[in-house]
Amino acid sequence: MRKTSKMINQIYQLTKPKFINVKYQEEAIDQENHILIRPNYMAVCHADQRYYQGKRDPKILNKKLPMAMIHESCGTVISDPTGTYEVGQKVVMIPNQSPMQSDEEFYENYMTGTHFLSSGFDGFMREFVSLPKDRVVAYDAIEDTVAAITEFVSVGMHAMNRLLTLAHSKRERIAVIGDGSLAFVVANIINYTLPEAEIVVIGRHWEKLELFSFAKECYITDNIPEDLAFDHAFECCGGDGTGPAINDLIRYIRPQGTILMMGVSEYKVNLNTRDALEKGLILVGSSRSGRIDFENAIQMMEVKKFANRLKNILYLEEPVREIKDIHRVFATDLNTAFKTVFKWEV
């Protein structure tokens, strides 16, 4: 019988809101079909911040914690018994752990039995990460700080895939409601995937809307023209603005359009179902992503024009070397309009 090699891993777990402890855990480092990766750069997600601040239902926190946060990360391969990757090769890690990959009909991120790293399971705030080889995607011609948000971009890619699969073929005008980092990524994905489409962005802050220089039109939410119309739309608001945002889209979208709902709300929202039914709309819930979405995200980020645009929503923090640095990063992220990225040097 082959002897299993093991190594002590340092796992930086959130034990309760704003409290982080290091867990030392012995782990196998030569599991069959698994690749060992050392995280390099990471990005903070709103979901991480909600856990850190304790802004989830106490029952949810009790169920999910303790766990290591962060599900957006790139790293380098330190061991690969499968021979798929070279030691030192740069890769991004897929947090969605599904029983099988997507097929022609069903997506891996919605499958029963799927779990997600940094949601009740340890995320990437560890000394090293062991993942099945199909949960790793290589990259080369992308800067590490941009590669760190691949998971975030892949979520937008998944939503675009849903649109292309479900929406009717008239795609001349597409709206994005929201002016944060998700809206910016989705607008770029529209521009990349459907370059002839006119992009309409609806937001609350002119200073943020100015970043959408490639959009055809930009509007403030309380000053939308009565005659505004578009074929399909993406809702990228989340939070308390989720309901009003979706209802604005229902109001202005053309009949038989498709609305992709991407924003997360902690509370149930009221929707204008009367107009949604009258217009024959398709409302689609879109969450997380799978391997194909990561591959598509990397292809887009390899295009310099889009990689350079994505840099506009990144704030590079100082490296993290110890627990106090993690607290610093999350404090900084609270006051950052877009994505906080940092180097992981524990």
From Swiss-Prot:
<dbReference type="InterPro" id="IPR036291">
    <property type="entry name" value="NAD(P)-bd_dom_sf"/>
</dbReference>
<dbReference type="Pfam" id="PF08240">
    <property type="entry name" value="ADH_N"/>
</dbReference>
<feature type="binding site">
    <location>
        <position position="45"/>
    </location>
    <ligand>
        <name>Zn(2+)</name>
    </ligand>
</feature>
<feature type="binding site">
    <location>
        <position position="71"/>
    </location>
    <ligand>
        <name>Zn(2+)</name>
    </ligand>
</feature>
<feature type="binding site">
    <location>
        <position position="72"/>
    </location>
    <ligand>
        <name>Zn(2+)</name>
    </ligand>
</feature>
<keyword id="KW-0479">Metal-binding</keyword>
<dbReference type="GO" id="GO:0071555">
    <property type="term" value="P:cell wall organization"/>
</dbReference>
<keyword id="KW-0961">Cell wall biogenesis/degradation</keyword>
<keyword id="KW-0862">Zinc</keyword>
<protein>
    <recommendedName>
        <fullName>Ribulose-5-phosphate reductase</fullName>
        <ecNumber>1.1.1.405</ecNumber>
    </recommendedName>
</protein>
<dbReference type="GO" id="GO:0050256">
    <property type="term" value="F:ribitol-5-phosphate 2-dehydrogenase [(NAD(P)+] activity"/>
</dbReference>
<comment type="similarity">
    <text>Belongs to the zinc-containing alcohol dehydrogenase family.</text>
</comment>
<comment type="pathway">
    <text>Cell wall biogenesis; poly(ribitol phosphate) teichoic acid biosynthesis.</text>
</comment>
<dbReference type="GO" id="GO:1902012">
    <property type="term" value="P:poly(ribitol phosphate) teichoic acid biosynthetic process"/>
</dbReference>
<feature type="binding site">
    <location>
        <position position="151"/>
    </location>
    <ligand>
        <name>Zn(2+)</name>
    </ligand>
</feature>
<keyword id="KW-0521">NADP</keyword>
<dbReference type="InterPro" id="IPR011032">
    <property type="entry name" value="GroES-like_sf"/>
</dbReference>
<keyword id="KW-0560">Oxidoreductase</keyword>
<dbReference type="InterPro" id="IPR034710">
    <property type="entry name" value="TarJ"/>
</dbReference>
<comment type="function">
    <text>Catalyzes the NADPH dependent reduction of D-ribulose 5-phosphate to D-ribitol 5-phosphate.</text>
</comment>
<dbReference type="GO" id="GO:0008270">
    <property type="term" value="F:zinc ion binding"/>
</dbReference>
<keyword id="KW-0777">Teichoic acid biosynthesis</keyword>
<dbReference type="InterPro" id="IPR013154">
    <property type="entry name" value="ADH-like_N"/>
</dbReference>
